[in-house]
Amino acid sequence: MTRPLLPLSRRLSLRLVLCVCVLIAAGCQLTSDRSQAGAGDGKTRDEVLVWLTTSDQSRAMATMPPAVFAAQPPLPIHIHIDEGKRYQRMLGFGAAITDASAWLIQHRMSPGQRDALLRELFGREGAGIGFDFTRLTIGASDFSRSHYSLDDVPAGQSDPKLDRFSIDPNRGDVIPVTRAAIGINPQLKVMASPWSAPGWMKTTNSLIKGTLKPVYYDAFARYLVKYVDAYAGAGIPIFALTLQNEPAFEPDDYPGMRLGAQARAAITGRHLGPMLAGRKQKVEIFDWDHNWDKPHEPLAVLHDPVAAPYVSAVAWHCYGGEVSAQSQVHAAFPDKDAYLTECSGGDWEPVRSGGLTLQARSLIIDTTRHWARGVLFWNLALDENRGPHAGGCATCRGVVTIDSKTGAVTRTDDYYALAHASRFVRRGAWRVASSEGRDGVDNVAFVNADDGSRVLVVTNSATDERRFSVATGARVFAYTLPARSLATFVWHPEGDSGTGR
């Protein structure tokens, strides 16, 4: 549902009324006030700040009365946090600025609407949810308005010197939207993935299906480097590349190609890796960029002695297999990072009856508990018809929905699942040990490196409320979470009364 901010005078009045309500009735609940999120000034060290979203969105990032640390025994559902046991450091959360997303934001919103949305998504002030990680497509994906690469030539021709390479197809939407996001959040990390090499490099001579001809391994690596250089020149530094989106899949009606482990290892180890090594602007290479069901694929590349030194991480998608594959690969190669680089919500999920907690549990809690340093959902924005797209998924959902006629914004379950982490867990935060989930209550805990704040994200997937206790050190608090809801808890260690931001 669309949630435009109230006029300032009404928000101030509402806030005053709610504060009085809390003073005169301890049980009074605050309604949603997204602009309040993160406020912690004046809170005591015994208070735990709470934000809540329910599946029906009757409360959406609602600021709730704080929980309080108090002497009490643990409840049957108990979350024990061990801050001394630390795992990966977080890079960030976000979603992909696909061609479709950028086109809608740039061409179906007024300048005021566009600025407000981008500040909300990428900023940390006011209602900002602080996305600091995004993904771009190198050429077209299914969520483009047409099929293209960045070096298309007439049928029967080739361009091994890449003389016709151009990022002009992106100058009208992807580049200005991404630059605007970076302007709001200069710390934004941008990764990029091709859906297909240019058709003339492939066995099908088409963007559709096929694989890369070995004779063009070097040209394809240079194609990716030219993309990095061209985007840097456009004011968009690329943090990381993958060689191919979903390299074990050949879609029938949109760009794609197979690229097996042997080919990826050869391109990475003998071409792309050496080309990127030693550059002033470091660009990382992530392998795989596909589902959890084939961990042997990235393992094969990481076992290659020539390719492995150039691979910094494994990129994962959620559409097959189990998230434990991330831990399987991490156990074999603990020096290689893990990222969830794509997962889409869609019409196949139970709307307002579990989709929220499914997304939060599977993609925020489970992935980070299995070593993910960053989490990316798929389309940042789609329209009311789940587009625009040229082939592929017709039922995928964006993090936000933009009305193609009015530019109005609807925030989806994916938005709130991400926001409950992205707003509070900042770059460099440590994921710390916490109890496994039980009885429908799942969690993940973090310690922010910048201000020492503690962040706990909890879902209740059950159809009734759940009461649980949380212990951190010698301190304990208890909370009752409504059915099918998601909450974030923020506090500071004893002796520190800083804010929750």
Q: Residues of each region from the PLM?
A:
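Residues that line or immediately flank small-molecule/substrate-binding pockets and catalytic motifs
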Residues: 97, 138, 245-246, 317-318, ...
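Bacterial N-terminal signal peptides
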Residues: 13-27
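Bacterial signal peptide processing site
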Residues: 29-31
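Short acidic/His/Gly/Ser-rich catalytic and metal-binding motifs that mark active-site loops
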Residues: 143-147, 198-205, 247-252, 294-297, ...
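N-terminal catalytic cores of secreted or lumenal carbohydrate-active enzymes
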Residues: 59-238, 270
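Bacterial N-terminal signal peptides that target proteins for export
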Residues: 2-17
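Boundary at the C-terminal end of the N-terminal hydrophobic targeting segment
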Residues: 37-39
